[in-house]
């Protein structure tokens, strides 16, 4: 789909909650799901993903894909959804934007390799709109069972590349956000080595992790869109080489 960013705010109505930009975001996460699943199935070499389409009664649906009992992955789940409907009453004052309807699409994944030398990972990337207001969220983190510093450096370098291309402020802020988001207060420790995390990222405002704030200066909607796409595409580069390196480590 060709995107006309000058008309990005079209839609967002009860008749068309997604608009062209929402449909483009959905197409983007579907393509990303294909890319990630193809890469993981190639690395595994034995098992394949089983697809389970589903529908949401209130509007929308998705497709879940699961690979089980593979040669490399014990289980890998990669799911995409696109849902819409009325903004719940409890969210009307807490959710950005205005208007009675919302649209949300995204991809979410959790991967568990068999070999403890290969790390578990989690990632998600999402686009949400309410009326004319649209924002992005997402992130990826890595949980090694056996820590290899070179793997940690590779993972962070791959995730930092799209951040640095968009703004020098992004990576340090999103890395710190991830560290705080996945901090286990009860155990007084972080979950794995972190990664990046961001939410409610929109042009002309600020983002906050509840502790610190960052102004989103000089970046219009198109720039943030390109960052979001690049951040999602960076996941395969960040994770797959690590699994290829560690899947046969004894």
Show which residues each predicted segment covers.
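Short, charged, low-complexity amphipathic alpha-helix
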Residues: 2-20
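Gly/Pro-rich turn-and-neighbor structural signature
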Residues: 17-96, 212-250
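Alpha-helical protein-protein interaction elements
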Residues: 20-21, 46, 65, 72, ...
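Generic hydrophobic secondary-structure signal
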Residues: 25-28, 32, 36, 40, ...
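Flexible, active-site-adjacent loop/turn segments at secondary-structure boundaries
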Residues: 47, 52, 65, 101, ...
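Solvent-exposed, non-transmembrane amphipathic alpha-helical segments
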Residues: 49, 56, 100, 127-131, ...
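Internal mixed beta-strand/loop scaffold within catalytic domains of large alpha/beta enzymes
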Residues: 64-138
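Long, contiguous internal "core" modules enriched in hydrophobic/ aromatic residues
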Residues: 134-249
């Amino acid at each position: 789909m060709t995107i006309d960013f000058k008309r990005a705010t079209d839609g967002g109505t009860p008749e068309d909650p997604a608009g062209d930009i929402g449909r483009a975001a959905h197409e983007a996460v579907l393509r990303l799901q294909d890319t990630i699943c193809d890469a993981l199935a190639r690395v595994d070499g034995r098992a394949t993903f089983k697809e389970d389409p589903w529908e949401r009664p209130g509007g929308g649906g998705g497709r879940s894909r699961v690979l089980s009992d593979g040669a490399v992955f014990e289980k890998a789940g990669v799911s995409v959804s696109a849902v819409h409907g009325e903004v719940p009453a409890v969210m009307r004052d807490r959710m950005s934007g205005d208007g009675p309807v919302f649209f949300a699409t995204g991809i979410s994944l959790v991967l568990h390799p068999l070999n403890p030398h290969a790390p578990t990972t989690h990632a998600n990337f999402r686009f949400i709109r309410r009326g004319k207001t649209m924002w992005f969220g997402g992130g990826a983190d890595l949980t090694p069972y056996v820590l290899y510093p070179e793997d940690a450096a590779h993972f962070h370098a791959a995730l930092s590349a799209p951040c640095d291309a968009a703004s020098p402020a992004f990576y340090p802020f999103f890395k710190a956000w991830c560290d705080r988001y996945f901090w286990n207060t009860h155990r007084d420790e972080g979950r794995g080595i972190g990664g990046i995390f961001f939410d409610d990222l929109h042009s002309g405002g600020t983002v906050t992790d509840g502790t610190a704030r960052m102004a989103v200066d000089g970046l219009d909607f198109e720039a943030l869109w390109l960052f979001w796409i690049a951040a999602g595409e960076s996941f395969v580069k960040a994770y797959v080489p690590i699994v290829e390196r560690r899947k046969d480590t004894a």
